[in-house]
C-alpha cells in the first residue's frame, strides 16, 4: 500500500499530564484527517517523531542536516517494507510542512509527493528579510526546547552540540543581521527548497494562506532576487498544484479563524 507520513517534533509534546498525543495515537491535531479520509481507500498512515523527540533517539538538530537524514531514513524504511508499494508522501502543517521539504532535499526515490501546508522552505529568509530580523528570531530555536524534554533526569543528555548551536544562532542573527557569521553555514544548511530543486523526483501540492504572518507567503512565492519558488518548480518541470487563499496560519477549512 502507499504510505502518507506526518513527520513532527510535536508528538508527546509538553509537560506530563498536558502533553500532546504520541505517535501511536491518531489525533485531530495531526493525522486524523488522513486516517479518516485515506485509510479507507487503501493507504497507510505513518506518524514519525524527529530526532530526540518522543521516543526517537539522536540529537535534536532544528531543521538541520541531522534532522533531514533522520527523516530520509524514515522515508527509506517506509518505502521498503513488505506491506508498502514503495510510494511515500509527507503531509503536514507548519513545522510538519517543513519536514516535507527536508525530505525532498534528500532525494529519496520513494518520496513521490509532498503536501506542505504553510511549511517553512528556508529558515534564514523566514527570520531575516528586508534588512532586518524578526523579533522571534532570537528565541525561535529555544521555542522548540520543549520538544526534547521528558521532564526527568535524562534531559541533560539531550543538550547535544546541535541544540547548543541553535541557542547561539538565534540571538546572533537578531543582533548582527547581515554580519551574522552563521549566515553562510547554519542558515544555508537549513535552506531546503533550493537543494530539493532538481534532486527531488516527485510532485508538490502547496497549501498556503496569504494572510499567514507566521510562515509568510514569500516562503512559497519569494526567494533570492529574481526567484519565485512556486514558478521555479513549474519551470523545472515539476507537477505542481496549489490551494492558495485568504486565511492565516491555519488549514484552509479554518479560514474564518
Regions found by a protein language model. Give the residues of each.
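Cap/lid segment of the alpha/beta-hydrolase catalytic domain
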Residues: 3-79
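Accessory cap/linker subdomain of secreted extracellular hydrolases
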Residues: 13-16, 20-24, 28-34, 40, ...
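Alpha/beta-hydrolase fold nucleophile elbow
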Residues: 82-95
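Alpha/beta-hydrolase-fold catalytic nucleophile elbow
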Residues: 91, 115-118, 207, 243-246
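Glycine-rich nucleophile elbow surrounding the catalytic serine of serine-hydrolase chemistry
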Residues: 92-102, 214
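Short beta-strand/loop motif that positions the catalytic acidic residue
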Residues: 200, 206-208, 212
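Conserved alpha/beta-hydrolase "acid-adjacent" motif
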Residues: 213-227
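Catalytic histidine neighborhood in serine/cysteine hydrolases
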Residues: 230-251
Amino acid at each position: 500500500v502507499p504510505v502518507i507520513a506526518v513527520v513532527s517534533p510535536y508528538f508527546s509534546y509538553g509537560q506530563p499530564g498536558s502533553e500532546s498525543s504520541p505517535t501511536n495515537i491518531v489525533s485531530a491535531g495531526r493525522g486524523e484527517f488522513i486516517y479518516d479520509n485515506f485509510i479507507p481507500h487503501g493507504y497507510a498512515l505513518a506518524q514519525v517523531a524527529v530526532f530526540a523527540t518522543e521516543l526517537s533517539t539522536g540529537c535534536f538538530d532544528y531543521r538541520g542536516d541531522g534532522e533531514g537524514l533522520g527523516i530520509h531514513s524514515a522515508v527509506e524504511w517506509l518505502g521498503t517494507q513488505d506491506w508498502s508499494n514503495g510510494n511515500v508522501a509527507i503531509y503536514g502543517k507548519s513545522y510538519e510542512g517543513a519536514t516535507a521539504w527536508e525530505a525532498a532535499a534528500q532525494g529519496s526515490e520513494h518520496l513521490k509527493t509532498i503536501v506542505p501546508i504553510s511549511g517553512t522552505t528556508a529558515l534564514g529568509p523566514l527570520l531575516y528579510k528586508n534588512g532586518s530580523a524578526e523579533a522571534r528570531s532570537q528565541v525561535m530555536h529555544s521555542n522548540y526546547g520543549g520538544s526534547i524534554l521528558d521532564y526527568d533526569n535524562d534531559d541533560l543528555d539531550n543538550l547535544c552540540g546541535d541544540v547548543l548551536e541553535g541557542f547561539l544562532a538565534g540571538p546572533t542573527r537578531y543582533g548582527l543581521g547581515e554580519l551574522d557569521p552563521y549566515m553562510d553555514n547554519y542558515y544555508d544548511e537549513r535552506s531546503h527548497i533550493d537543494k530539493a530543486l532538481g534532486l527531488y523526483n516527485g510532485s508538490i501540492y502547496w497549501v498556503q494562506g496569504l494572510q499567514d504572518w507566521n510562515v509568510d507567503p514569500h516562503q512559497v512565492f519569494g526567494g533570492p532576487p529574481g526567484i519565485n519558488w512556486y514558478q521555479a518548480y513549474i519551470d523545472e518541470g515539476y507537477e505542481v498544484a496549489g490551494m492558495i487563499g485568504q486565511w492565516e496560519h491555519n488549514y484552509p477549512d479554518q479560514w474564518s479563524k
